[in-house]
């Protein structure tokens, strides 16, 4: 006895076009994948000689997964106003919700972000990188702050929106959500 089996025609190309893969679902992305990225810039010039923390760049992100890590990359070009001795600190803070980062948790600190003795430049930090694990899907706000530690005379630390008039930002903060392992 012979048994014959017939199957309907199957066209792989048609089946693939039926799938909606314009974007890979976040849940299917492997650990350590970048889920989202946000960029923020200094949009006006800032001059400070304050020993209190002064906000330079602020940005927000809402993680999709509570297990995600948040990578904060900061690229800044601080200048020292006039030629007096100047030492300034930089820090990155995190707050939960919009408008909360200025007094939030410190996650990165650099005591000598900018240091000048007299008219000689001694040190300048152009980049700060921090990895945060906030364990939430609420809006997070990150802020880069600067404060003057010591100064002689009237030195200021300065950040420009466009220092040389070339139409390109000079100070930028990039915030990325990185998929966690769970």
Give residue spans per PLM region.
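Glycine-rich, low-complexity segments
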Residues: 2-45, 180-182
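Terminal beta-strand-rich extracellular "head" domains
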Residues: 41-51, 62-139, 143-182
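Secreted extracellular polysaccharide-interacting domains
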Residues: 53-55
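Extended, low-complexity regulatory regions
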Residues: 57-59
């Amino acid at each position: 006895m012979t048994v014959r089996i017939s199957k309907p025609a199957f066209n792989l190309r048609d089946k693939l076009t039926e799938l909606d893969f314009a974007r890979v679902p976040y849940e299917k992305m492997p650990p350590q994948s970048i889920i989202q990225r946000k960029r923020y810039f200094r949009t006006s010039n800032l001059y400070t000689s304050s020993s209190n923390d002064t906000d330079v760049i602020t940005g927000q992100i809402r993680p999709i997964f509570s297990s995600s890590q948040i990578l904060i990359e900061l690229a800044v070009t601080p200048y020292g106003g006039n030629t007096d001795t100047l030492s300034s600190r930089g820090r990155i803070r995190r707050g939960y919700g919009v408008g909360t980062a200025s007094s939030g948790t410190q996650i990165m600190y650099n005591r000598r972000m900018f240091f000048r003795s007299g008219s000689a430049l001694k040190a300048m930090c152009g980049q700060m990188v921090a990895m945060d694990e906030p364990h939430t899907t609420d809006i997070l706000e990150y802020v880069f702050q600067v404060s003057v530690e010591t100064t002689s005379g009237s030195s200021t630390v300065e950040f420009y929106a466009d220092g040389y008039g070339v139409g390109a930002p000079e100070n930028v903060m990039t915030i990325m959500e990185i998929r966690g392992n769970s």
